């Protein structure tokens, strides 16, 4: 999720499709809390958890990343972590993110930042954790990368 002048979800090689979604080139537009909730639910199952890692950034950094994501285009299957790590490495303050094809390695590299906040969602229902996450989402600074 990039929260800049507009809030989008970059879903590289993503499979989340619905007729009501505004999607172009693996970018889901209008990432309001309902869409974010649906996105988390879509990717979280009894054998897969979803971890959200957040870093607050300046408006300039968020806008720069947003523009690069929008111009990136659709990503081939199996290149999701590679595309995210490449885009982050081009972002001021994120140059030390490891280049990788592996989502777990990307998550570990991102977690090495001192300013990362993280929450993990499991199924079937993380109601309390989700309520706390959305309360926090409403209080955090406007510009960030999740």
Put a short name on every predicted segment.
Residues 1-48:
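Glycine-rich catalytic cores of cysteine/serine-nucleophile enzymes that process amide/ester linkages
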Residues 18, 60-65, 118:
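Residues in flexible loops and secondary-structure boundaries
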Residues 30, 46-48, 56, 71, ...:
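Residue-level signal for the start and early helices of compact helical domains
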Residues 41-62:
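A structural motif
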Residues 67-146:
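Activation targets extended, charge/polar-rich intrinsically disordered C-terminal tails
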